[in-house]
């Protein structure tokens, strides 16, 4: 599968990785999950002046849109794994599992948030108990 080959560079889906990392580190507050599982990006967007480089949201959506639809989920899985490894190396033990859960939770919905055609939700195996899709 060429998708797996594609996720070798640390550069790959860089904005996605940044976003996943940012979400993982947030315990509450910020644009994480609202109750119905939709994102609340509005706050994020308003802080960005028009003169700044495109907000992270736009960057990672561009990255995903450049992937082949077939590769979107495998590549996101790769990105999630990379972020997970970063967190496991650097953060203190406490709360780590929760962060990892948040990475996968966030990644699962990125295609939908970015309106990727043909992909809405990536069926990652959840690390938490509950249905695995």
From Swiss-Prot:
It holds the Pfam family Tryp_alpha_amyl. The keyword Transmembrane helix does not apply. Keywords: Disulfide bond, Seed storage protein, Storage protein. Transmembrane segments: none annotated. The small, basic, water-soluble napins are one of the two major kinds of storage proteins synthesized in the seed during its maturation. The mature protein consists of a small and a large chain linked by disulfide bonds. This is Napin-1. The lineage of its organism: Eukaryota, Viridiplantae, Streptophyta, Embryophyta, Tracheophyta.
């Amino acid at each position: 599968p060429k998708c797996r080959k594609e996720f070798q560079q640390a550069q790959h889906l860089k904005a996605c990785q940044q976003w996943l990392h940012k979400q993982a580190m947030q315990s509450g507050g910020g644009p994480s999950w609202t109750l119905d599982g939709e994102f609340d990006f509005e706050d994020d967007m308003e802080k960005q002046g028009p003169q700044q480089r495109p907000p992270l949201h736009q960057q990672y959506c561009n990255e995903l849109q450049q992937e082949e639809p077939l590769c979107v989920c495998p590549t996101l899985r790769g990105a999630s794994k990379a972020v997970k490894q970063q967190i496991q190396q650097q953060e203190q033990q406490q709360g780590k599992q929760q962060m990892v859960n948040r990475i996968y939770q966030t990644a699962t919905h990125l295609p939908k948030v970015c309106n990727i055609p043909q992909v809405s939700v990536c069926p990652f195996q959840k690390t938490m108990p509950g249905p695995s899709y």
